Amino acid sequence: MIDPKLLRTDPDAVRRSQAARGEDSSVVDDVVAADEARREAIAAHENLRAEQKGLGKRIAKASGDEKAELLSRTKTISGEVADLKKAADEADAKFTELAKTLGNIVIDGVPAGGEDEGVIKETVGTPRDFAAEGFEPKDHLEIGEALGAIDMERGTKISGSRFYVLTGVGAQLEFALLNLAMSKAAQWGFTPMIPPALVKPSAMEGTGFLGQAADDVYYLPKDDQYLVGTSEVALAAFHSDEILDDAELPKRYVAFSPCYRREAGSYGKDTRGIFRVHWFDKVEMFVYCLPQEAEAWHEKLLSFEKDFITALQIPFQVLDVASGDLGLSAARKFDCYGWLPTQNRYREITSTSNCTTFQARRLSIRHRGPDGVEPLATLNGTLCAMTRIIIMLLENHQQADGSVRIPEALRPYLGGREFIEPVK
C-alpha cells in the first residue's frame, strides 16, 4: 500500500504513477475522498469519546440533579460512541480496500510504456555461432530426452499438461544449481531458508498477489490457503506484524521452494518442454532494508543475479522493465533475459524488484530508528529458476556429438564432470 500522506500532500504524483502503469488514474479521487471520510469519522468518534471520558470525571464531583443529568447523558452517549466507532471502522475499511487497488509509486526514470517498451541496460556475453561450428542446435527438450534428464510424457501422465519429471542427470543438475546458488548467496551474506509453500490469504494479499495476479495463483478453498508462485510471499510475511531495530538491518534471506503457477492467459504459449510450467523450483533472494537504501540494494541484487548467470556462461541481457509491466508491488524491476539458441532470442530467466515500503505497509513490517517507528523497504530477486536455467545450460552448452559441456563453476557440484553424455 502506498503512503496515505502522499495521497493528501501530492495526489497528482499518485495519478501520474497510475497513468504510467496504464491504470485508471481517476480511482485516486475515490481513494482521496475515502481518506477524507475516514479521517472525519475517526475524528467524530474520538471527540465524542473524549466527551464521554470527561463526563466520568464530572459525575464523580457532581451531586443531585446535575449528577442525574450527567448520568442520563452518559447512557445516551454510550450508544452514540458505539455507533461512531462502527462508522469509523467501516470508513477505515473502505479506505484500506480502495487504497490497496493502487499500485506502488513508480520510481522516476523507469521507462514508460507496456510489456514491449522495456529498455536494455546492458548485454553480457556473445551467443555461439552454431553455423560456424558446423551443426544445427537442438532444443532443450530434445537434448534433455537424449540425456535421460527430462520426461514430459510421464509428467503429463502423472499431473496433466505443463508438468514434467526431472530424471537422472536432470535431477542432478537441479541439485548442483541449488548448491552453487546457496554457496554464492552465503558468501553475499544471505541466511538460507526453506519456507512453507502454502500460505494464508493475508500473506498472499499482503505481497500484492491477489490483485492483478489473482488468476495465476492456486487456491485451496477447504483450507483457505494458497500455493505460492514464489517464495517471495513467505519471505515477506516472515516478519509481518513485527518491528525490527535499525541495527538488525539489512536482513538478507535466500530461500529454496517449489513455485506453483496456473499460467492463466498463457494458453498456446511455450507449450513444448519445461519453459512455461505449472510447477518449478526456485532459489529466491529477499532483502529488508531502510527505505533510503532500497535503490542501492536493488542494484546489488541485480549484480548477484548477473554474477550467477555469468558463472554459468550464459549470454544475457538486462532489461529495465517498463512502467506498465511492473506488477502491483514493484516500483522498479530489472529482468535478466538469457539467450535461447533455438528461438534465436533472449528469454526471461530472472527478475528483481524494488517494492519500496509498499509490501511492508500491507504486512505491517516496521523499523525502529531515531525518528521513531516507520515502514521499512522490501526487495526480491530470482537467483535461480531451475527449469529455465536448465534450459539455458542444455541449449547454450550443447555439443555436436549430443553431449552438454558443464560450466566450470558447476563442476564441483557434479562430481567434477566436464560433460554430460547422451544415454540414448
From Swiss-Prot:
Its EC number is 6.1.1.11. Keywords: Aminoacyl-tRNA synthetase, ATP-binding, Cytoplasm, Ligase, Nucleotide-binding, Protein biosynthesis. It catalyses: tRNA(Ser) + L-serine + ATP = L-seryl-tRNA(Ser) + AMP + diphosphate + H(+); tRNA(Sec) + L-serine + ATP = L-seryl-tRNA(Sec) + AMP + diphosphate + H(+). L-serine binds at T230, S231, E232, E284, T382. Signal peptide: none annotated. PROSITE patterns: AA_TRNA_LIGASE_II. This is Serine--tRNA ligase. It comes from Cutibacterium acnes (strain DSM 16379 / KPA171202). The lineage of its organism: Bacteria, Bacillati, Actinomycetota, Actinomycetes, Propionibacteriales. The gene is serS.
